[in-house]
Amino acid sequence: LYASRRLLCTQTDGDDAQKKTTTYKEQDPAKVTHYLTQLAEFSDYQRVYLDETGFDRYLFRPYARSLKGQIVKAQISGKRYQRLSLVSAQVGNRLIAPMVYQNMMTGAFFEAWFQQCLLPALTQKSVIILDNARFHRMGVLREMAEKLGHKVLPLAPYSPEFNPIEKVWADIKRYLRTVLSDYARFDDAIMSYFDFTWL
């Protein structure tokens, strides 16, 4: 649910990544090919894609209705608003082990979520796919995962288009624009997405 250097996991109840039309210029085609070759070797494993994203409480609607030919004007605040982050994993069309947290993610904090929230949510052998963020210490994560029969596979660098959870983050941000004013707590607004969409 919500964590500020503490863990409180929320469990929710395929399919695989669909490539977008844009890529980073830094992307290395050879590394992408290597990643896809490795992924194919885990054809009998459940695919688990994980990622983190951030949300600012300051969200506003960029569009509004008006009479034809009239411009809609609105004032927006220049103040800084609360920022929260979300880490979760996606299995097929479901998100699992979502956790909202404050402050920066660290290796130790991520590993605690990975061990205490994600791994217990996996009910069959899985290949866990994630990017190469600094706090993703692959050696530590592999050791924890392999003890339970799972594998860890890093995405090719600069290749978010191969992680389908990226599209979910965009969906959540659109959802928040419509419901944020209904909630006193920012974290409650974020977690309400799982209540209405994923259960």
Task: Specify the residue positions occupied by each region the protein language model found.
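Short functional hotspots at interaction and active-site rims
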Residues: 1-199
